[in-house]
Amino acid sequence: MSGSYTPAPGGPFSALTPSMWPQDILAKYCQKDPGTEVELQYDEFGFRIDSEDGVETRKWLCGDGAPQREDPQQRLRWQAHLEFTHNHTVGDLTWDKITPTLARSDRLRSLVLGGIPHSMRPQLWMRLSGALQKKRTSDISYREIVKNSSNDDTTAAKQIEKDLLRTMPTNACFNTLTSVGVPKLRRVLRGLAWLYPDIGYCQGTGMVVSCLLLFLEEEDALWMMCALIEDLLPPSYFSSTLLGVQTDQRVLRQLIVQYLPRLDKLLQEHDIELSLITLHWFLTAFASVVDIRILLRIWDLLFYEGSMVLFQVTLGMLKIKEDELVSSENSASIFNTLSDLPSQLEDGAAVLGEAVRLAGSLSQENLDTHRHKHLAYILAEQAQLNSNNSHSLNTNLNKVVRRQNMRRKSTLSSLLWGEDEVEALKAKNIKQTELVAALREAINRTAEHFHCLDPRNCSTDLTPDYSMESHQRDHENFLVVSRNRRRRAKALLDFERHDDDELGFRKNDIITIISQKDEHCWVGELNGLRGWFPAKFVEILDERSKEYSLAGDDTVTEAVNDLVRGSLCPALKAIFQHGLKKPSILGGPCHPWLFIEEAASKEVERDFNSVYSRLVLCKTYRLDEDGKVLTPEELLYRAVQSVNMSHDTAHVQMDVKFRSLICVGLNEQVLHLWLEVLCSSMSAVEKWYHPWSFLRSPGWVQIKCELRVLSKFAFSLSQDCELPTKKEEKEQRPLKEGVQDMLVKHHLFSWDIDG
């Protein structure tokens, strides 16, 4: 490359793939001025060398163990093997002449155990793992994956952004946002989260990907991860449940009983839970756990033999330190020794040698038997804790399914010649299945959020009711007014109790309102105590047909906002966009919000005058804001108008309006009824959607049943949280207007605390 710098052989960054060479740092190394010194020193892999261990590191680099200092005899043995098995014609053997997969043999395994020459690792890893075969036979290209995932504004994408600089902070390729590896890491992780929607993003994948990127191009790194996820590791290794890696921890514990009985006795005597340490080893495939030079030797074997290597290496590491562990005096010493064990290893060949010597007899058949047994135990335990999630648990046991992508004709060819009907119909059916699966996943994740944070929701049934009677009950339930007449409020800040007739509370406490006779001072009850408090210090809760939950309040629990606006709303928008008619080339905009506006208006215009008068009554006199007056149609119309009024002044996009409307529907517990209202507006639906769309087909009924599950949870989401905050509306402490009046009344009047 013109104007680029190349690392010195054996020097800093010399073991990295050329695209990862940090040019800004190499430029400093290549400066001719002998008086100029680089502030930080880096090793051949780009890791920062600390001053206290710099001498030891340089000694290691000068030894025979450095990967770039290849043994000529070792390289010749690999070349001879490849020539013998692949070169059947006269001429030089090149990588493009070698098949995508290498035939397994004792000779090949022996070569892998002896180590792969570092310069040959990128090509051999791709072939040993099967990643190259996946890359060449995939229906979707890496470019398409990046394009599709770049617009995937999900919770996973936000979490990836937070973790980019945490993944490998001591490596020059990943320690700042401008580092050469960070954009690559972002694209690969977002691509994996899009490619495997059932998995999403797991922090363990970030560790593995960052290490792969040091030696492979980003496209190859993605396909290596596909091989790991689909073939080399069991299902659900990186899923939200971590069932696969949890199972392997129990299998490891049983193997220790068999192979390391002295260590097993020690762990039992001191009641040490080994998985607290080793789960991270397995989840990251030892990336960021052991020294990078040892990791390369482990991965050589892992990509050839699969997950069995994780057990063999762990057993070998424990065997090396067994005597030291057994001689430990107490539990703390044992735990610390186990935690520090990987960082104390220096010889990769010794680790692999001990692993093969001790656990070389371990077979894949034995491993699978152990896994099936312990997986059954885990599922039985989790089923007892939450029988309602048995469906999601069983789903996680299935083989990991990659998202499919149907290649479409260009817009011009579609206009001129149309689409192949059979292919188009197949693509639409597959797309509909994916849309429902994505929505169901978003709903289940939201429900699990409530299960984890609010114990009252643990017994909530998440199974959609598809019966005909359920639709009749929807409207009956909507018309039933809650008999719970108590009013409650949430504390906006702390209020300290000074007198016996005052009610003290902390921010976010839930207070039962006893009296609101006075404008400034209310009487309430909390934890069996009654007293007065400033009305401005609390906010009335919206609990018409529900009981307030902190898990659904985005001012208290920020995660619920990410789940709804970052996961549920995109899934719903995809359904509303499916089959939406595109405008002509010179036509206007096309967005689900425009359809919602029109359908909502059409449903209320039949009796517009009476509806308008009721809306005015509700707004002016607060008459029946709990649904006794307003029907679902009227609530939808009112919500659309409210969103437009608040959002138009901020000039936000229609995507934001759509997400805000979904939040209102969740607050009102009528999201499923609103879908029915919209799909029942046939004139608007036929105008905006193709016949094969969800909203014009009977498929919308299934979507309604899925959404009904969310009506079982109490949401308190802000409609305007995505709007820019005005300066004059910045948060203020509610201690200004009216507080003087409240204090005067407190001293001049006696309060009837008992109401």
From Swiss-Prot:
It holds the Pfam family SH3_1. Signal peptide: none annotated. Gene3D superfamilies: 1.20.58.900, putative rabgap domain of human tbc1 domain family member 14 like domains, SH3 Domains, Ypt/Rab-GAP domain of gyp1p, domain 3. Residues 115-306 form the Rab-GAP TBC domain. One of its GO terms (molecular function) is GTPase activator activity. Residues 559-722 form the RUN domain. The keyword Coiled coil applies. Residues 419-445 form a coiled coil. Residues 484-543 form the SH3 domain. Belongs to the small G protein signaling modulator family. This is Small G protein signaling modulator 3. It comes from Danio rerio. The gene is sgsm3.
